Amino acid sequence: MSDLSGASRPKLCPGCRLREPAGESDMLLIPEGALRLAGPGRKIVERCDGQHTLDDIVRELKAEYPTAEPSRIETEVNTFLERLHQKRVIDLES
């Protein structure tokens, strides 16, 4: 079970970073290889800086995608960050 809450401040773990776009799909480089980021994945990971809370990330994405269903954004951000946490790609600060 994840420790993810609205006040959690996700931060990329050491050795994990975004690959700068070179005309291809966005990639998150991790010590074990790379993860392809789809949809708003890059925008979520960019906010995993230890400063933004989960609530901040969800609020900013709702503003950026005003036609998307708000509850879907919240669910997808939560699920995505839980997966990254399980893979030890992000730490959760409080």
Q: At which residue positions do the language-model features occur?
A:
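Long, low-complexity, charged/polar intrinsically disordered regions in eukaryotic proteins
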Residues: 1-32
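Long, charge-rich, low-complexity alpha-helical segments
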Residues: 34-94
